[in-house]
Amino acid sequence: FFNFIIEQGCCPDGRQARQHNPFQERADLVKLKNPLLAVRDMERSKTFYREVLGLHVVMDFGANVTLTGGLCLQTLDTWTDFLGKEVEEIRFGANDSEVYFEEDDFDGFLAHLVGCADVVYVRPPLEHRWGQRVVRLYDPDRHIIEVGENMKSVCRRFRDQGMTPEQIAARMEVPLKFVTGCLR
């Protein structure tokens, strides 16, 4: 949600985001490319991401796999080698980060999860105070995966419930400009 606000260049209260960063003056900025998760069992992880989230292998180098959307999986033994660490120094299930996905058909996704045998929920699905519905679950290595309702879908759901754009903006705690953009 907040990434979308940042991409739109405005703060939650409607002001334009203003930050000076000397790196912005460079043409060769660093760019986030691929989040990477260390995994104990590559095949089990590929199966989970395919069956639960619908991601497919784009590139498979054996010890490193890139899935649709850019998520990378790395075998634990090669990851520890890259870091110069021991396996015991890698902590799975620390509950201190997540990988975030969005879904247009959130109700359909929840129905899909019911048919997935190995899904372990961090907590049941919930609706945040701004109206976005989310579900958090663990992957086989207990990395937290969040799937949230697409913000355009949230705006449209509220509109379909009879709310005006102004009411939606107030309910979601976002600028009216954000709401009107989502409703186009």
At which residue positions do the language-model features occur?
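Extreme N-terminal basic, low-complexity initiation segments
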Residues: 1-9
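N-terminal beta-strand motif that seeds the catalytic metal site of vicinal oxygen chelate
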Residues: 10-44, 97-99, 150-184
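Conserved short beta-strand elements that form part of the metal-binding/catalytic scaffold
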Residues: 14, 56-93, 144-149
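Vicinal oxygen chelate
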Residues: 40-42, 94-141, 161, 174-177, ...
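Amphipathic alpha-helical segments
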Residues: 41-55
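Conserved acetyl-CoA-binding loop of GNAT-fold acetyltransferases
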Residues: 51-58, 118-119, 174
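A contiguous, mid-protein "functional segment" used to position or interact
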Residues: 136-153
